[in-house]
Design a protein with these regions (language model features):
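Acidic catalytic motifs of isoprenoid enzymes
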Residues: 1-164, 168-183, 190, 194-229
Length: 229
């Protein structure tokens, strides 16, 4: 359930584009510093959005730096360094690890399985640093998996579990902002789950996998047909 939150560059001012890129590059640098180069392949725009949100809510003052990297080896580019970038880098590892395991379970994706093993050490380090969050995320994913395993066709139940997961990630502290950030993450997580189901629908039908929308539609068709029997 990652890769759905992106920006539309055509609607951004130059200063906003620059800031977005600085947050994205800052996340990449934080992953490299905290979890080694291999972790940078987990980089995604969803987490960049979370950095921007938390920076705005907490009015975080970030340090702006310059560097070259393997993607930009010739010219230096700016990136930002700060508390929430490091927090989001850790959460990115947490979610990416579970997402890779999900890809392995659903598609038997060998690359996903191998990559999960490569970042497992970082995953354990994050779990040790944020035990409560790691446990809550695991609980939400277990709830989600149980719903899908039992073929429960009500998509709202699975969306609620997804909402719990995002709500946990979006609230870094137990403070005055926690409730609103958690509620925001919860609502966004529910939306993303349904969106993800729509995106995967054709593929799930082709491979005969469980899809909450496919099962719901088929159930409704069967129900309607029974009226005419």
């Amino acid at each position: 359930m990652v890769g759905n939150i992106v920006t539309n560059p055509k609607l951004l001012e130059d200063t906003d584009k620059r800031y977005y890129r600085e947050c994205y590059c800052g996340l990449c640098k934080s992953l490299q510093r905290k979890h080694k180069n291999i972790s940078r392949f987990t980089l995604n725009y969803d987490m960049t959005f979370l950095i921007i949100l938390l920076n705005e809510v907490y009015k975080e003052k970030n340090e702006k730096l310059e560097c070259r990297c393997m993607m930009h080896p010739v010219h230096k580019h700016t990136y930002i360094k700060g508390t929430f970038i490091d927090y989001v880098a850790d959460m990115n590892i947490l979610l990416s690890y579970y997402n890779l395991l999900d890809d392995w379970q659903d598609d038997k994706n060998v690359f996903a399985n191998c990559y999960a093993k490569l970042i497992k050490k970082s995953f354990k380090k994050v779990c040790k640093k944020y035990p409560k969050k790691a446990q809550n995320v695991q609980n939400a994913l277990k709830e989600l998996n149980d719903i899908e395993t039992k073929n429960i066709i009500n998509p709202d139940l699975a969306a609620q579990a997804s909402g719990k997961l995002f709500g946990e990630i979006f609230a870094p502290y137990e403070d005055e902002y926690e409730e609103k950030l958690r509620d925001f993450g919860d609502a966004l997580g529910k939306f993303i789950y349904i969106l993800d189901a729509c995106i995967d629908l054709e593929k799930d039908i082709k491979h005969k996998r469980f899809d909450r929308l496919k099962e719901l539609v088929e159930s409704q068709i069967a129900k309607n047909n029974s009226k005419y029997v």
